[in-house]
Amino acid sequence: MSEKFDYDLIIIGSGAAGMSAARAAAASKIRVAIIENELVGSKSDIYRVAQLSASDIANQYYEAKKFLQLSNNQDTLTYNYPSLFETIQKRVKKYILAKKKSFANFKIDLIHGDAHFISPYEVAVANKRYSAKRFLVCTGRSMDLGAISGIETTNYYLPEDIFMRVKKLPKIVLVVGAGKKGIETAEYLAKMGCKVIVTEKEDTILEGYDKEAIEVVTNKLVSGLKIKILTNTKVVAIQKDKNETVSSGRRVATVKVTMKRGADEKTVRVEAIVFAINNRPNVELGLENAGIKFSDQGIVVNDQLETSVSHIFAAGDVVANPIKQSVGYSTEKAAYEGTLAVNNILKRNKLTLTYRHFSTVLNTTPKSVTVGLTEKDCLSRGIKCKIVIVPEIETTHSLIASEKLGFLKLICDKDKKLLGATIVAKNADLAVMEIVAGMYGDLTLLEHASMPHINESFSDIVRIAAKNLM
């Protein structure tokens, strides 16, 4: 590539898409820089590390309490949250350090700050300009709270605050938004002993997920963790309120929250409010100066991740891509897009997008994992499909499992080719890998049904489902 540019490739954003792209590009011995305005690894990746670490701790605490009850032990189990918080912070710092080392290993320049396109070949960061032959935009998405009265003058939290910054958990919490982040946050708080209310403006939680998965997760949250879920409910105003004694028995500063459901209006007082709603693409970087087409859905790309400007590509959550499945996005998909974009930037055999083999995991207990198409995806695309649902209770594994709430939903087309699956189970993220491998290698239902499985393992459910679909 030409020496008249500072770099052969500038990547804007160091999330999953940006990091995978940087590694692929650096391995090709070209000059690469990443521009990042946050911590290395991007907020979404760092959030994921913090959330998984916190959930691991919450699960251990929750299971320990259940064990005491099972053994009729009357002891009260407590925790030292500052110590637990420090453990989470250590894991996050370890992750950030590993990302920084990877930059050094691949000889990637790291430029801190906000990038702004000046022209199709140049960006400004603070008072400096950087030019490149090619650009890859991986700026992700951010929370958009919209028009909520009092939002500017009232303290509130985002999910990342709960896992990464809050050193003392509130006792009564309202979580606004019942998507993946909202539900994971609500479950974590409830397992740590908080009273939790969840509001969702749609008529169901986890919109886009299979209805069977929603039913199991909802039952676990409501019956098991005593979380109150209010659907078709919109928060319209929040207000810092006076100190008062709340139902937890503590005298604290409260937040007055006004909600509407249809014509009915209701007010609640909580110790904290967490917003997990309305992600919007981060497109405020002068895209118009480079001639890049974008909308409120994100940057417009083709199926090779090329924007309206041939030398500029985009990948990850910032992309407005109609191919994405109804269960949203994942780090794995973003990383795949980043690598694919670099392949196409380097003019190799051009690759086109396909999400057939990718999975999305909801990190609750039990976990819900979706790979490929959902039933809703098939209906929206006019695909005739055959579906089988196998409850966990039909497996030998259920005889030794403490909970038997799970199931496998397997979907195939009229030619009995696997299209997708949803698994709800404690170890769903492990069990799904057989299906991912099978779809990737185009295994037939007969091959799945004939494959030797460990009889007492949950993964035997795949064999049972495949046999039932034949």
Predicted regions and their residues:
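Glycine-rich flavin
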Residues: 2-7, 23-169, 202-206, 211-213, ...
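Beta1/beta-strand and adjacent pyrophosphate-binding region of the FAD-binding site
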Residues: 3-17, 169-179
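Short hydrophobic core segments
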Residues: 10-12, 115, 130-140, 175-176, ...
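Flexible, glycine-rich terminal cap/loop adjacent to redox cofactors
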Residues: 10-59, 363-374, 379-470
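Short glycine-/small-residue-rich Rossmann-like dinucleotide-binding loops
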Residues: 15, 36, 140-141, 261, ...
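Glycine-rich dinucleotide-binding loop and its adjacent helix/turn
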Residues: 139-195, 199-201, 229, 288-290, ...
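A conserved FAD-binding loop/helix module that cradles the flavin
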Residues: 213, 315-377, 455-470
